Amino acid sequence: MYTCGIDVGSVSTEAVILFRDNENPDVKGRIVSYVIIPTGASSKDAALKSFEEACLKASVSKEDVSSIVATGYGRINIPFANKNITEISCHARGVLHYFTAVKTVIDIGGQERKARADHMALWPMLWTLGFI
C-alpha cells in the first residue's frame, strides 16, 4: 500500500511516498521517493507538482496511492488530500513511530520556528487527537 505526505510551506513543498506491506503490518513504512520543490505563488500547484514528481520518481501511478495527508502552512489548499493535519501533530506522530528515543524536535520553517522537547509531553495531545 502506498501513501503520500505533502508538506506545503511558505518557501518549499515536500512530498514523500511511503510503502507499507499489508502482509507484514509490523514493518514500518518504507520511503520509496521524496521531492522538495519551491512553493512559489500557488501552494495548490506546488502540492500537485510535488505529488506527481514523487509518484514518477517512485514509478507509482497516482491511482496506486491510497491516501494523501497534507500538512504545513498551505495544507488547507490541497483539495486532493484525504486529510490535513497540523505540523506539530505530524512531528509528534512521526517521531513516536520512527525515532522513539528522540526527545526534541526542531522545525525551522520559512515563516516560523518551532521546538518541542520531551516527546512524552505529546502523549496527551496525541491521545486527544485519536492517534494512539
Where are these regions (language model features)?
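Short glycine-aspartate micro-motif
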Residues: 3-7, 65-69, 103-106, 126
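Short glycine-rich, Thr/Ser-proximal phosphate-binding strand/loop in the N-terminal lobe
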Residues: 5-45, 53, 121-129
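Structured core elements
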Residues: 5-7, 14-17, 69, 77, ...
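Generic secondary-structure signature for well-ordered alpha-helical cores
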Residues: 18, 23, 52-60, 70, ...
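Short beta-strand-loop/turn "lid" adjacent to the catalytic site in phosphate-handling enzymes
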Residues: 33-40, 57-89, 123
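Conserved glycine-centered beta->alpha loop in an early N-terminal alpha/beta scaffold
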Residues: 48
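Conserved phosphate-binding catalytic cores of ATP/NTP-utilizing and phosphoryl-transfer enzymes
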Residues: 73-119
